[in-house]
């Protein structure tokens, strides 16, 4: 199959692509590829090309209100340290581990392990 399409991304053929596209000589697939690859200005009509400066995009009101409300990064304390992190709200209760329960479970396991070791030594 012969390739009749010109390469739209190589810099040395841009003038040829612009000439062919301005005369409507590009195939629909080639022009679609140019649009997707960012070379759409090569496919558009010469009078449709605007080389002026882009207008600055106004930040959204939501982003501005977040800055006003103190969202984003938390301000630092006067001594340079960041504020301590607050725990996130969770609808599920966080189980509190009772130290006595933990101590008794660990003690039982230690006694059981000691019994196994003593049994192996005695054999």
Curated annotation (Swiss-Prot):
Gene: C11orf71
Entries under InterPro entries matching the protein: DUF4687
Pfam families reported for this sequence: DUF4687 (PF15747)
The protein, known as: Uncharacterized protein C11orf71
Domain of life the protein comes from: Eukaryota
Biased composition (Basic and acidic residues): 61-82
Transmembrane segments: none
Positions of region (Disordered): 1-25, 53-91
Compositional bias segments (type: Polar residues): 1-12
